[in-house]
Design a protein with these regions (language model features):
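Membrane-proximal helix-turn-helix segments that form the acceptor-binding/catalytic region
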Residues: 29, 155-174
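Carbohydrate-associated surface elements
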Residues: 180, 199
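Conserved donor-binding/catalytic core segment of Leloir-type glycosyltransferases
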Residues: 208-226, 232-235, 248
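Glycosyltransferase donor-sugar binding loop
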Residues: 219, 232, 246-259, 273
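Nucleotide-activated donor-binding/catalytic signature segment of Leloir-type glycosyltransferases, i.e.
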Residues: 259-278
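Aromatic "clamp/platform" in nucleotide-sugar-dependent glycosyltransferases that forms part
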Residues: 295
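Short hydrophobic beta-strand element within catalytic cores of glycosyltransferases
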Residues: 312-315
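Conserved acidic donor-binding segment of nucleotide-sugar-dependent glycosyltransferases
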Residues: 327-338, 346-352
Length: 389
């Protein structure tokens, strides 16, 4: 196995739109594959075109404008969406996916690239026609819209739900990022995935950064689905007991949240916005305690990143978080606002408890959720597929 192709609509790159979890994962994954000597091809579409070569990395993002070029199809797709006619909307969404797959075929032929395997994400159903390339492919369950809708209440159109279902039921190889993820995909699509847990980079050296006493860090997008309202409520209670307490937001959307909820600026809140790389690690290492009150996750990557830095965490009572945290050993699971308040207050007041929880959290990630293990297990899975094709 020499060449791995990643078929994606999201990738963390300075010349691409801001990336979420999928794009960040593939950036980190690609870097690790290149370090191991593999050739990596990134192909997909997004709102910004990108074409380039850097050593063993080939990137080609086409501009996503299929429906702008086919406005009659867009008219019928929109009609199907508005009238909730799933088959009509899905029919034209499939045409877009088919067009992208055909462009991938043309790209591979033109550049004489022969991937040994293709990896792609589960959302938007973009794997639907990959079987036509006669190249083994793997779908990694980053969290498709149908799953997010069913379990966490996210919005999804009927047509998109239909093509995601069709694509996943058709996929010969599915990677799930946790036991909880595996269960959700099996219940929804009748397909049992292979568990390869996500992980974080544990090889970095700590960046010197003093801990801010009585600081609560919220690491993620400031929105209701991430439980930001809970974080604010808990913080306001903590501030009455600990007047010097501060809430630190590392992620997007804080100003938008304030506008949408008609809230004024809150005292003792520090908003860093979106951070990445060493700057992110430097800021996160200032935390005394992390709060993760999300209402739904297929995996807790941000949670793992905080624990990997040797920080105490208090997280929502979600199956995906319970997969990672052993309650009261390497973190805390909170079932309501009272418990968030009690656990964070205890971590503020008892330095020995905070230290013990933090040290055990770091060991948990190093042993079980190390990104190097994610890469190693993924490559072994690829090879197994290739050997049996």
């Amino acid at each position: 196995m020499k060449t791995i192709l990643i078929f994606t609509q999201e990738y963390l790159h300075s010349k691409q739109p801001p990336a979420g979890g999928t794009g960040s994962f593939y950036k980190k994954y690609t870097s690790s594959l290149l370090e191991k000597g593999y050739k990596v091809v990134i192909f997909g579409n997004s709102s910004v075109a990108l074409n380039g070569q850097d050593g063993n990395l080939r990137i080609c993002f086409l501009k996503r404008n299929y429906f702008k070029k086919h406005f009659i199809q867009e008219l019928f797709r929109s009609l199907g969406k508005r009238l909730k006619i799933a088959a009509l909307e899905a029919y034209f969404l499939k045409k877009e996916v088919k067009d992208l797959t055909n462009k991938l075929k043309e790209f591979l032929k033109k550049e004489n690239i022969r991937p040994d395997i293709i990896e792609t994400h589960d959302w938007n159903g973009i794997s639907l026609f990959l079987d036509e390339l006669s190249i083994p492919y793997v779908v990694r369950a980053h969290g498709c819209y149908k799953i997010l809708n069913k379990y966490f209440g996210y919005n999804i159109t009927l047509g998109l739900s239909l093509i995601e279902s069709e694509a996943l039921k058709k996929a010969p190889h599915l990677v799930c990022v946790s036991k909880n993820s595996q269960q959700m995909y099996e219940e929804t699509f009748g397909k049992t995935g292979t568990i390869i847990t996500n992980g974080v980079d544990c090889s970095h050296k700590p960046i010197s950064s003093d801990t801010i006493p009585f600081s609560v860090f919220f690491f993620g997008t400031a929105m209701l689905k991430k439980g930001f309202d809970t974080a604010l409520n808990v913080f306001n209670r903590l501030r009455k007991r600990f007047p010097e307490a501060t809430l630190h937001i590392v992620g997007r959307n804080y100003e938008v949240y304030l506008r949408e909820t008609h809230l004024e600026e809150i005292k003792n809140v520090v908003n860093y916005g979106f951070l990445d790389g060493d700057e992110l690690k430097e800021v996160l290492q200032k935390a005394s305690v992390f709060i993760f009150p999300s209402r739904g996750e297929t995996f807790g990557l941000a949670l793992c990143e905080a624990m990997a830095l040797g920080k105490a965490v208090v997280a929502a009572d979600l199956p995906s978080f319970r997969d990672i945290i052993t309650h009261k050993e390497d973190g805390f699971i909170a079932k309501n606002e009272d418990e968030y308040y009690e656990y964070i207050a205890a971590l503020f007041e008892e330095a020995s408890l905070n230290k013990s929880i933090s040290e055990k959290a770091q060991k948990t990630i190093e042993h079980q959720y190390n990104f190097e293990k994610t890469v190693k297990n993924s490559l072994a899975y690829y090879q197994k597929i290739i050997n049996t094709k």
